[in-house]
Amino acid sequence: MLTIGTALRADATRVMLLGSGELGKEVAIECQRLGIEVIAVDRYADAPAMQVAHRSHVINMLDGDALKALVEAERPDYIVPEIEAIATDMLVTLENQGHHVVPCAEATRLTMNREGIRRLAAETLGVPTSTYRFADSEERFHQAVEAIGYPCIVKPVMSSSGKGQSLIRSAEQLAQAWVYAQQGGRAGGGRVIVEGLVNFDFEITLLTIHAVDGIHFCAPIGHRQEDGDYRESWQPQRMSALAQERAQKMASDVVKALGGYGLFGVELFVCGDEVIFSEVSPRPHDTGMVTMISQDLSEFALHVRAFLGLPIGAVRQYGASASAVILPELDSDNVRYQELESALLPHTQIRLFGKPDISGKRRMGVALASAETTDDAIEIAKRVAASVKVSG
């Protein structure tokens, strides 16, 4: 039976967030609603989740010794990774020493590396994926591209938000694509994955919850990507009953193999009734921000319930809903937002993340909308996002 202590007291239930961006902020808020003591950690000060946490720390989370020292000092009941740039080998060590990593250290280690999760899905579980090859040198990269054929995509095995990814259509692009992949890798270079292009009708994120009362699914979320990042997402994404059944089976198999309780963002390609696995994140997903308006329990509330060992029961979806990112481009450490009065149309909401600065393009907020149809919800959310004026 779960017992939650009182925050800031000796018996407090403590959650340490490793990563304190906009997704971590919502997880922190859900923890606060249950009286949980929140410790927010990131590589920079005043990150969004730090603004709603009891305490915060700035460290290099890729430094295993620094991470270990902080965990030992704070003694959290739950360590909740919210980003991928973490010393995952140290998380494994900490888990072996008795610390609770969400959903588990092995899931975090496997999913931060495209090679780990691809081999688990395709080779261990036999899940359909794109054709692929791995390469750790420019020569082997050329061989991998030759084996896959054109067009193909190259990605660092360790990167996020589209960093280091290129679409290759001809041999003339190989040298530039290799250099870009090496620059975009999280560890400053290394192995890459070369993937064949997948013919698909649409992409979905299937939010899958592994909880004490079993596996649960949210309604499929459709989304549009640009430059490796999502721009709009919507729920529900219409798909055939057979495709949805296959998607749920695939997501369930992957999530169970990864292990641990929590919410997982499973990314899939859908073509007719066929479903192909893409990636999975063992944490709330950026495209899932639409659930802040589309469901009775957001993806963040579901994640917290699951890792605490609480039952999920059923998830109610309210109908056609969408999100659109607020993505200004400027340079400032004193960002201001205006025109909110005119931006807020009926049945819409805005979330401003409170990021302390911006250099170039940065996701600073999200617009949420509900409507009669998903197409209408998308257009309304885009209109709201575009109406928010951001200046420095």
Curated annotation (Swiss-Prot):
Transmembrane segments: none annotated. Mg(2+) binds at residues 267, 279. GO terms for molecular function: ATP binding; magnesium ion binding; phosphoribosylglycinamide formyltransferase 2 activity; phosphoribosylglycinamide formyltransferase activity. GO terms for cellular component: cytosol. N(1)-(5-phospho-beta-D-ribosyl)glycinamide binds at residues 22-23, 82, 286, 355, 362-363. Its EC number is 6.3.1.21. Pfam families: ATP-grasp, PurT_C, RS_preATP-grasp-like. It comes from the Bacteria. Residues 119-308 form the ATP-grasp domain. Keywords: ATP-binding, Ligase, Magnesium, Metal-binding, Nucleotide-binding, Purine biosynthesis. GO terms for biological process: 'de novo' IMP biosynthetic process. It is an enzyme of class 6 (ligase). Pathway: Purine metabolism; IMP biosynthesis via de novo pathway; N(2)-formyl-N(1)-(5-phospho-D-ribosyl)glycinamide from N(1)-(5-phospho-D-ribosyl)glycinamide (formate route): step 1/1. SUPFAM superfamilies: Glutathione synthetase ATP-binding domain-like (SSF56059), PreATP-grasp domain (SSF52440), Rudiment single hybrid motif (SSF51246). It catalyses: N(1)-(5-phospho-beta-D-ribosyl)glycinamide + formate + ATP = N(2)-formyl-N(1)-(5-phospho-beta-D-ribosyl)glycinamide + ADP + phosphate + H(+). ATP binds at residues 114, 155, 160-165, 195-198, 203. Involved in the de novo purine biosynthesis. Catalyzes the transfer of formate to 5-phospho-ribosyl-glycinamide (GAR), producing 5-phospho-ribosyl-N-formylglycinamide (FGAR). Formate is provided by PurU via hydrolysis of 10-formyl-tetrahydrofolate. Homodimer. Belongs to the PurK/PurT family. This is Formate-dependent phosphoribosylglycinamide formyltransferase. It comes from Pectobacterium atrosepticum (strain SCRI 1043 / ATCC BAA-672) (Erwinia carotovora subsp. atroseptica). The gene is purT.
